[in-house]
């Protein structure tokens, strides 16, 4: 209800537009991301208990070979207490990195989960079939970054990457959860046309 607008900037800053007769802009946090091509600070979402814990989650490209989802605490419009939530997410340091993140309850309302989407990292040669990689996948974690054991490809000690929720995504730049049903809709960017998919557990 604060009417603030959070903005991510590719080059590193997360900014807040503060409401008022004349809106003002302030810096919430500044990363030092890898910014080649489609890399950078990519998305932001808020904890369902934000009013109490003030948690803000941010997806960004940490290096030419790694993306991360981190959590900051909103301390009067300043991000503090950075915590790594999910690390080691794949990137080739170029394109099709995806970068969307969001939080939803499961469709039975039993808990809250963190989702993210990553494209094929510019590799169109079947990385979606590689179940050890999160490239070309939608991932799902608990809010602390741990793996839910009801993820569809969970196999404990491997070889699958247990975070995988769905696969076969070329460049899933953004997604949304449908209010009420919590259905996941992923927007997949193409070369000459775009596609929108309703994505369910284990889809390909």
Regions found by a protein language model. Give the residues of each.
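Acidic, Gly/Ser/Thr-rich repeat motifs that build Ca2+-stabilized beta-propeller blades
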Residues: 1-125, 174-189, 194-196
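Short, surface-exposed polybasic-and-hydrophobic patches located at secondary-structure transitions
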Residues: 3-7, 13, 151-165
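Beta-strand initiation motifs
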Residues: 21-27, 74-83, 145-161, 203-204
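Short, glycine/acidic-rich beta->alpha junctions
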Residues: 36, 93, 157, 164-168
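Beta-propeller blade signature
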Residues: 68-76, 129-144, 198-201
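A structural motif
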Residues: 112-115, 140-149
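Flexible glycine/proline-enriched surface loops and loop-helix/loop-strand junctions
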Residues: 119-124, 155-160, 168-171
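Extracytoplasmic, non-cytosolic globular domains
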Residues: 133-141, 163-192, 197-200
């Amino acid at each position: 209800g604060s009417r603030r607008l959070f903005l991510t900037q590719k080059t590193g800053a997360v900014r807040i537009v503060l409401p008022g007769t004349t809106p003002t802009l302030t810096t919430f946090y500044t990363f030092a991301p890898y910014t080649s091509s489609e890399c950078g600070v990519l998305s932001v979402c808020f904890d369902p208990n934000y009013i109490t814990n003030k948690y803000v989650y941010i997806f960004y490209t940490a290096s030419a070979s790694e993306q991360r989802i981190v959590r900051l605490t909103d301390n009067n419009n300043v991000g503090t207490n950075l915590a790594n939530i999910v690390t080691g997410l794949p990137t080739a340091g170029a394109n099709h990195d995806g970068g969307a993140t969001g939080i939803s309850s499961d469709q039975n309302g039993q808990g809250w989960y963190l989702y993210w989407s990553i494209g094929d990292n510019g590799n169109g040669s079947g990385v979606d079939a590689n179940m050890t990689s999160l490239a070309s996948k939608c991932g799902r974690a608990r809010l602390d970054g741990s793996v839910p054991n009801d993820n569809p490809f969970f196999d404990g000690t491997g070889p699958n990457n247990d975070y995988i929720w769905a696969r076969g995504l070329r460049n899933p730049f953004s997604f949304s959860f449908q209010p009420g049903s919590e259905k996941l809709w992923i927007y997949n960017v193409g070369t000459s046309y775009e596609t929108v998919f309703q994505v369910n557990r284990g889809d390909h």
